[in-house]
């Protein structure tokens, strides 16, 4: 009874299409894709900034340890 079959998934998909319509689902998918791209870009920018800061710290340590 708790198993999810292909027919149950098709019924749920049909209900979603009937409730929201195909146009709304297309715009929702596009908005979701844009949000994911923005999130990934922000994460990459943050990682690049952290690497630059870490690289600067390493250079500062090398210079300070030179005698």
UniProtKB/Swiss-Prot annotation:
Keywords: Cell inner membrane, Cell membrane, Membrane, Protein transport, Translocation, Transmembrane, Transmembrane helix, Transport. Residues 46-67 are annotated as: Disordered. The keyword Cell division does not apply. Gene3D superfamilies: 1.20.5.3310. It holds the Pfam family TatA_B_E. Belongs to the TatA/E family. TatE subfamily. HAMAP family: TatA_E, TatE. This is Probable Sec-independent protein translocase protein TatE. It comes from Citrobacter koseri (strain ATCC BAA-895 / CDC 4225-83 / SGSC4696). The lineage of its organism: Bacteria, Pseudomonadati, Pseudomonadota, Gammaproteobacteria, Enterobacterales.
